[in-house]
Regions:
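ATP-dependent adenylation/nucleotidyltransferase module used to activate substrates
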Residues: 5, 9-155, 161-164, 191-199
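Residue-level detector of flexible, active-site-proximal loop/helix-junction positions
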Residues: 79-81, 107-109, 172-175, 188, ...
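Short, solvent-exposed polar/charged micro-motifs at secondary-structure junctions
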Residues: 111-114, 216-218, 247-250
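Catalytic subdomain that performs nucleotidyl-dependent activation
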Residues: 149-226
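Conserved anion/nucleotide-ligand pocket segment
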Residues: 227, 231
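A short, charged, Gly/Pro-tolerant segment at domain boundaries
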Residues: 233-251
């Protein structure tokens, strides 16, 4: 059973709800890709959006299980773009029992002369700070909130702009880098996450970045929706296709 909390005139009311479908989907991804192991110290990348908030909620529930034994905490990288949602985020994480640390940076000041702010630059700077923090504080894994749609959209963007087949791996380890990136939401799509966030009562208290509306990802999302008709089963087929490559019948 999980607790669901909603904001009502500045107060938080909690109720108990059954384990949602989203958590079962995350469990499958975690199991399939061996994302959580005994002794892990996992840093949750808490952007404040519905995806990473749902991910933190999952980890809060997962920590209550007996096995595997691991530790998890969250880091929010606050930027000069704005973090007006932060007070609510802190309260929600505290209620779940997830320690949340906030680090403030200026992504605008880091832009080179003549360059414009975009999704890639902002996200790369936040991941850089996440990696530094993880190494400094003994975390061996960073949990990112990228979901199934993100992965497929990235594959489409790379195929149509770079002419290469590449996306976001569920687990990304490095030979010369001590921190592994994991994406527990890799099998969950946007509608599933939205339904969960609505059910848990935090869909309206999480953030959405305005720069996403002007990015190539918005176009890729539209293409993915047309290609799959928004059906989860077809998205999973595309995801599986990225793993089942028959080179004998390719150029």
């Amino acid at each position: 059973m999980q607790r669901s909390c909603i904001f009502v005139i500045g107060r938080i009311h909690c109720r108990v709800m059954a384990n949602p479908k989203l958590f079962r989907t995350i469990d499958k991804a975690v199991s399939d890709y061996n994302m959580i192991e005994s002794g892990d110290h996992i840093l949750i990348a808490a952007s404040g959006g519905k995806d990473s908030t749902a991910l933190a909620e999952y980890f809060a529930a997962r920590l209550k299980r007996k096995h595997p034994v691991f530790e998890a905490a969250a880091l929010h990288i606050a930027t000069d773009i704005g973090s007006a949602f932060l007070p609510g985020l802190k309260q929600r994480f505290a209620d779940w029992g997830i320690d949340l640390t906030v680090k403030t940076i200026s992504v605008l000041d880091r832009l080179k002369a003549g360059k414009k702010m975009n999704c890639w630059w902002c996200s790369s700077q936040r991941r850089l700070e996440l990696s530094r923090y993880a190494q400094q504080h003994g975390y061996n894994k960073i949990a990112l909130g990228h979901h199934l749609d993100d992965i497929l959209e990235t594959a489409l963007m790379n195929a149509l702009t770079k002419g290469e087949l590449a996306a976001m791996p569920p687990v990304l380890a490095f030979d010369k880098f001590p921190v592994t990136f994991i994406r527990p939401l890799c099998l969950a799509d946007i509608p599933m996450i939205i339904r969960h966030a609505e059910m848990q009562g935090y869909i309206s208290s999480t953030c959405t970045c305005n720069y996403q509306e002007n990015s190539g990802r918005k176009t890729a999302r539209s293409r993915l929706d047309k290609l799959t008709d928004g059906k989860y089963e077809l998205k999973r087929k595309l995801f599986d296709a990225l793993k089942n490559i028959n080179t004998e019948y390719l150029p």
